[in-house]
C-alpha cells in the first residue's frame, strides 16, 4: 500500500499539504458495544451438541458404507461446517479411501469430481486423468454429461483445486461455467437448484469464507429431500452457538477499540474494528482460538492505521521518523514523533504488550517476537513506497512485486495468526518456516496485493498514490489498463495454483498451519471480489450481519 502525502513542514512552522483519502466512516456506531451472552441458551445448545456429536462420530467410523457414500458424508460434514469436530476420524477414513480408490469404478461425473475435490482438499494428489472417461475422441465433454447439472457443478468446484500444468482443469473450468450459466437461464432447473448454482458461480467452495459458506449450505441442505436430520440439527446448533461466542468476542474487541480512542487522534484512518474481527474469524473460527482471534484483530487494526498513515496522511520526513521509531521499538523513541504519531506508536507498543501477556498465560508468547519483526519489515517497505511516490518513480513490475510481497502483509498476518494456535501446532519450527519465505505465504500475499491493486486503482490514483502493480505493469509492457488487469488476474490464478500445490502431501509443515494461510487467502477473494470491501465496508455489510448477528432458525 502506498503513499499519497505531499509536502513537508517548512522550517517546522507551516502545516504541510496532505492529500487526505476521506475514507468512509465506520458503519457500526455503538451497535456492538454491548452484548450479554445467554448462558442458559448456551448450555442448552452445548448439551444437545455433545449428544449429536457422538451420534455423528459413530456415523463417520461405521463400516459397511460404500466409498462413494463415505465421501459424500465427509463432504456434507465439511460443507455444513461441523467437520472440525471430527478431524481425526475424517483423516483416518480418507487415508483408507484414497489407498483403495479405483478409477475404473462405474462412478458418474458428480462422484468422481467429488472424490477429486475432497482428496485434494486434504492433500491427496489425485490425478485429473480420472476425468478422461467423460471426454470423447476429440477430448471434448460427452453430451451425456454436459447437461448433467449436478455433475457440472461438482466438476466446477473441483477445478478450483488445480495446480500448475493441469490444462485440462483450466478447460473444464471455462466449460462448466458456460454450461452452468446456460442451464440456469433455461427452464429445466428447480428454483432451489438454480439458487445453488448461482451462488456457486459467485463464490466457489474452495475460495469461500468457511463459516459463511457453511451457513449458505445449511439453507440448501435443509431443502434437500435426502438430508440427514441429525447432521442438519448439529449444523444449526453449532453455527448458532459459535455465533454467540463470536458475538461476545466482537463486543470485547469493539469496546476495547472504543476505549483506546485511537481514531479520534488519527481521524484520517479507516475505522474498521468489526471488519478486522471478520477477517480474523476467517483465519480461524474454531472456539478454542478466541485468544488468537483477539490478538490477530488488534494487530490488524494497528497495521491498518499504520498503512493509512503512510498511504494518506504522513509527510515523507514524518514517515522516516516513524519508520526509525518502529525499528527501535522503544517507548523513548516517541519523543521524536509528531503528536498524532505518538498516539499511534504508543498504541502499537501497548497492543503487542497486551497480546504477549495474553499468550504468555498459555505458554505461547514466543511467536510475538516474529510478529514484531514482520511489522518492522512492513513499515520499512511502506517507507520505500513513500519515497517512490515523493520522487514520482514508477518501478519495474518485478521491483514493485518484491516490495509489494512485504506490504501485502502475508508474513505478518501468517505469523500473527500462528501465534494464536496451540503450542504443539505452532512450534518454533513453524515460525522459522515463515522466515524461509515459503511459496505458499508468497502466493497468499500476491493474491491479496494484486486483487487490491486492481479493485482500488481508480480511487487511489484520483487522490494521488504511488504507482501500483497495475501502473507498473502497464508502463513496463506498454499495454492498456484492461490488458494489464487480464495479466494480473492470470498471476492471481497462478498464485492459487501454488497454494493448492503446497497443500499436497508431503507438506512442508502441518496441514493445521497451512489451512490458516489458505484461509487468509480466502478472505482476499471474498472482500475484494468486486470492489475494495475493506475500504468500503458497506460491500461486506451483509456478510458481517449474517456471521455475527443473524442466527439460523431452528
Curated annotation (Swiss-Prot):
Pathway membership: Secondary metabolite biosynthesis; terpenoid biosynthesis
Pfam families, alphabetized: Terpene_synth, Terpene_synth_C
Binding site for Mg(2+) 2: 307, 311
Enzyme class: lyase
Molecular function terms, GO-annotated: carbon-oxygen lyase activity, acting on phosphates; magnesium ion binding; terpene synthase activity
SUPFAM superfamilies xrefs: Terpenoid cyclases/Protein prenyltransferases (SSF48239), Terpenoid synthases (SSF48576)
EC code(s) of this entry: 4.2.3.204
Catalytic activity field: (2E,6E)-farnesyl diphosphate + H2O = valerianol + diphosphate
InterPro entries linked: Isoprenoid_synthase_dom_sf (IPR008949), Terpene_cyclase-like_1_C (IPR034741), Terpene_cyclase_plant_C1 (IPR044814), Terpene_synth_N (IPR001906), Terpene_synth_N_sf (IPR036965), Terpene_synthase-like (IPR050148), Terpene_synthase_metal-bd (IPR005630), Terpenoid_cyclase/PrenylTrfase (IPR008930)
Keyword Protease: no
Entry keyword set: Lyase, Magnesium, Metal-binding
Domain comment as written in the entry: The Asp-Asp-Xaa-Xaa-Asp/Glu (DDXXD/E) motif is important for the catalytic activity, presumably through binding to Mg(2+).
Described function: Terpene synthase that catalyzes the biosynthesis of the terpene valerianol, which is a volatile compound of floral scent.
Protein name: Valerianol synthase TPS1F
Organism name: Camellia hiemalis
Taxon lineage: Eukaryota, Viridiplantae, Streptophyta, Embryophyta, Tracheophyta
Gene: TPS1F
Amino acid at each position: 500500500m502506498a503513499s499519497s502525502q505531499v509536502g513537508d513542514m517548512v522550517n517546522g512552522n507551516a502545516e504541510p499539504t496532505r492529500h487526505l483519502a476521506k475514507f468512509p466512516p465506520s458503519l457500526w456506531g455503538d451497535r456492538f458495544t454491548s452484548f450479554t451472552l445467554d448462558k442458559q441458551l448456551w448450555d442448552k445448545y452445548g448439551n444437545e451438541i455433545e449428544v449429536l456429536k457422538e451420534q455423528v462420530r459413530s456415523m463417520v467410523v461405521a463400516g459397511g458404507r460404500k466409498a462413494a457414500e463415505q465421501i459424500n458424508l465427509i463432504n456434507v460434514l465439511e460443507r455444513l461446517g461441523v467437520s472440525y469436530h471430527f478431524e481425526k476420524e475424517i483423516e483416518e477414513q480418507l487415508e483408507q479411501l484414497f489407498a483403495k480408490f479405483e478409477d475404473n469404478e462405474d462412478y458418474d461425473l458428480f462422484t468422481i469430481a467429488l472424490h477429486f475435490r475432497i482428496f485434494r482438499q486434504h492433500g491427496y494428489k489425485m490425478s485429473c486423468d480420472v476425468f478422461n472417461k467423460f471426454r470423447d475422441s476429440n477430448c471434448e465433454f460427452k453430451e451425456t454429461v454436459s447437461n448433467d447439472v449436478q455433475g457440472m457443478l461438482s466438476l466446477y468446484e473441483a477445478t478450483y483445486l488445480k495446480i500448475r500444468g493441469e490444462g485440462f482443469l483450466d478447460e473444464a473450468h471455462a466449460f462448466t461455467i458456460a454450461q452452468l450459466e446456460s442451464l440456469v437461464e433455461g427452464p429445466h432447473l428447480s428454483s432451489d437448484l438454480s439458487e445453488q448454482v448461482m451462488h456457486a458461480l459467485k463464490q466457489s467452495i474452495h475460495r469461500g469464507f468457511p463459516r459463511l459458506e457453511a451457513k449458505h449450505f445449511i439453507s440448501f441442505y435443509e431443502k434437500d429431500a435426502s438430508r440427514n436430520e441429525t447432521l442438519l440439527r448439529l449444523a444449526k446448533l453449532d453455527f448458532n452457538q459459535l455465533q454467540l461466542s463470536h458475538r461476545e468476542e466482537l463486543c470485547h474487541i469493539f469496546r476495547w477499540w472504543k476505549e483506546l480512542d485511537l481514531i479520534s487522534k488519527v481521524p484520517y484512518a479507516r475505522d474498521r474494528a468489526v471488519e478486522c474481527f471478520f477477517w480474523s474469524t476467517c483465519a480461524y473460527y474454531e472456539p478454542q482460538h478466541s485468544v488468537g482471534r483477539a490478538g490477530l484483530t488488534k494487530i490488524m487494526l494497528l497495521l491498518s492505521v499504520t498503512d493509512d498513515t503512510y498511504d494518506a496522511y504522513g509527510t515523507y520526513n514524518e514517515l522516516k521518523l516513524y519508520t526509525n521509531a518502529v525499528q527501535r521499538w522503544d517507548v523513548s523513541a516517541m519523543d521524536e514523533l509528531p503528536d498524532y504519531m505518538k498516539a499511534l506508536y504508543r498504541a502499537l507498543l501497548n497492543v503487542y504488550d497486551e497480546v504477549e501477556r495474553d499468550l504468555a498465560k498459555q505458554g505461547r508468547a514466543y511467536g510475538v517476537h516474529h510478529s514484531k519483526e514482520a511489522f518492522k519489515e512492513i513499515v520499512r517497505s511502506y517507507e520505500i513506497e513513500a519515497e517512490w511516490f515523493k520522487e514520482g518513480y514508477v518501478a519495474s513490475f518485478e521491483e514493485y512485486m518484491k516490495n509489494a510481497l512485504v506490504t501485502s502483509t502475508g508474513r505478518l498476518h501468517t505469523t500473527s495468526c500462528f501465534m494464536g494456535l496451540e503450542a504443539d501446532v505452532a512450534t518454533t519450527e513453524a515460525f522459522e518456516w515463515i522466515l524461509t519465505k515459503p511459496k505458499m505465504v508468497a502466493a497468499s500475499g500476491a493474491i491479496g496485493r494484486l486483487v487490491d491493486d486492481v479493485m482500488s486503482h481508480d480511487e487511489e490514483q484520483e487522490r494521488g498514490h504511488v504507482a501500483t502493480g497495475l501502473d507498473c505493469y502497464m508502463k513496463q509492457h506498454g499495454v492498456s489498463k484492461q490488458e494489464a488487469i487480464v495479466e494480473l488476474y492470470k498471476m492471481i490464478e497462478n498464485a492459487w495454483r501454488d497454494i493448492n500445490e503446497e497443500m499436497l502431501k508431503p507438506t512442508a509443515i502441518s496441514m493445521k498451519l497451512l489451512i490458516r494461510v489458505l484461509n487468509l487467502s480466502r478472505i482476499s477473494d471474498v472482500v475484494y471480489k468486486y470492489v475494495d470491501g475493506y475500504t468500503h465496508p458497506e460491500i461486506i455489510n451483509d456478510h458481517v450481519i449474517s456471521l455475527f448477528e443473524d442466527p439460523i432458525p431452528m
